[in-house]
Amino acid sequence: MSYTQKVLDELKARYPEQPEFIQAATEILGTIQPALDAHPEYEEAALLERLVEPERIVMFRVPWVDDQGKVQVNRGYRVEFNSAIGPYKGGLRFNPTVTLGMLKFLGLEQVLKNSLTTLPMGGGKGGSDFDPKGKSNNEIMHFCQSFMTELYRHIGPNTDVPAGDLGVGGREVAYMFGQYKRLTNEWTGVLTGKGLSFGGSLARTEATGYGLVYFVDEYLKSRGDSFEGKNVVVHGSGNVAIYAVQKVAQLGGKVLACSDTHGWVEDPDGIDYTVLEHVYNQKRSGHDKGVTLAMYVDEKPNAVWHEGDGRGVWQLACDIALPCARENTLLLEDAQALVANGCKVVGEGANMPTTIEATTYFQENGVAFMPGKAANAGGVLVSGLEMSQNAEHLSWTFEEVDGKLEQLMRGMFHNVDDTAKEYGEEGNFVMGANIAGFLKVADAMLAQGVC
């Protein structure tokens, strides 16, 4: 039995109630055995056993008062996974589906993702089962303040620097930052994704979507191709999707469709990111609980709204597919439909949106598959640049930040591509990303001794 299989079997026996975490561990451990074969010292130091267990998990209750004066209680978490190469870094997710197993999966992915950025950032993830949808600004402020009243004890600019994620945007980050400052009497860059008036970075909002497209574009360039004239479908309509749509259009491609939890919209003229952004902001405001992506067709009469499962976008003929919503939203049958309809490239804008079965199908059928831990690293990359600006008490221009983002994302593609070639798996970007990210963390852990 291989070292990776032994560790994976132990994880499955220990955490049977954490399927998302097991899925992430399976995807990673299933591809890094060649690196372990080349470095037997990793097994001697029980490095994998240490890598797959978080350094620390913080769990706490979050009591808050709603607009009716009723006390509500949610559960809060922070998984501080690995700090071998820098302070813990990773987002906070507010969503009813949040569980410890989900955050462990996201945290493990974050460790390798942050390693790939080349910036000194460890990996972590956190959040709560609080649902911000339909809540008033006052309720969200009360919740964020209560959440930070416990979390502040465990974070800091050189310890753990959270950011936003699903359900946590600039508003929520601002409320949490204000509470942290109030509790500590200290202004530090303890959160990223802040507003521009108090230490935020230009291009942070656009970073994940732009970075995804830069990464895919560098793949296309390496094969003598480009986005020019390409038809693209996007699953999702949130922050990542909006700016992926914008950047695809800037590079000459056309996004045919995007989706939300209520259905999907198809626009033969190409999805207009400004309308998409307007709908997203209406949803986020909380003033109208009935807002869905169907509003898009009110401003774009040529567009067609399809009620139902947003996964309908995968049935369209396209050259490139960009899943930008959430985990496990591109299934095997979706992969089969995409391949049958001529899709040649898939780039993950979300965290693990593609199931292992779908990923395997893409790889077996010649589709270039760009895993999220590399392709969607633009957000955390610019978070790292925000940390640098805060530490230096500087503010860079949009062009400076975007230029660094583009340079690092394009460089990241070549690191992943070259690593896959080095281990005899040219075109296997999953293996390339996992091994490249793993080696940096593994060497740092080995150098620091048993800790």
Each model region followed by its residue ranges:
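General beta-strand structural signal in soluble alpha/beta enzymes
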Residues: 159-163, 187-191, 234, 257-260, ...
